[in-house]
Amino acid sequence: MNLPRTPSFRLDGRRALVTGASSGIGLGAAVALAEAGAEVTLLARREATLAQVRDQIRAEGGKANILAADITELPAIREALQAQGPFEVLVNSAGLARHTPALEASAEDFDAVMAVNLRAAFFLTREVARGLIAAGKPGSLINISSQMGHVGGPERAVYAASKHALEGMTKAMALEWAPHGIRINTLCPTFIRTPLGEQTLQNPERKAWILSKIKLGRVGEVEDLMGPVVFLASDASAMMTGTHLIIDGGWTAE
């Protein structure tokens, strides 16, 4: 009898690009991918912080490079990716949240959130896919979405709109790029303890509401997402594309 073998979670020999890699979810994703054997390019605006992350990953035996850039500056990003690609793995983790009631949200709030969470994600993802197609390589692209890409919440209208749109964008791209061997999925976390998330958790009323919705009774940690990132990036998820992986402690189960 030939027993089935577990597909590999290793990423040796693959190049990965992680946006928002200087902190939070992006930092965790970069570390996880490096631990799995990928050569990781860390993309964010803060070059000094990126250099610290790179040096620590290298000190622990991983492979890492940095790309200091603003993902909303599309011509510069396009030029940089064309020079450094192709990347077999992408984690779009850079994001922006402005929690304002829908009746009070300004056009500037809307445009700022959409510029990062949707516009930059669209064009950066497309550029990575173009590089893979030109090189004739398969790949796995991961958009960090949110549970708010599947539900709504008070003071979340603009943010939820950006994440619902990201979900639809991911599905459409999956249909177009599957013939090229390019998979694309979303990872949808609940509230995670990050520098961005701490701003929300400092409000006692909001924190109480959040904990009432998370059935496991705690907010998420960056470490809760590191395994799922490696799973989606690796051959272990080879039959997944155009769908989502929700890590929300049971929030969306009801």
Identify the residue ranges that each predicted region occupies.
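C-terminal substrate-recognition "lid" of short-chain dehydrogenase/reductases
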Residues: 122, 183, 218-247, 252-253
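Residue(s) in the substrate-gating loop at a strand-loop-helix junction
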Residues: 146
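Substrate-binding pocket helix/loop in short-chain dehydrogenase/reductase
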Residues: 101-102, 106-114, 210
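Conserved glycine-rich cofactor-binding loop
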Residues: 15, 22-24
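Active-site helix of classical SDR
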Residues: 125, 162, 170
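Alpha-helical segment proximal to the catalytic Tyr-Lys
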Residues: 130, 175-179, 238
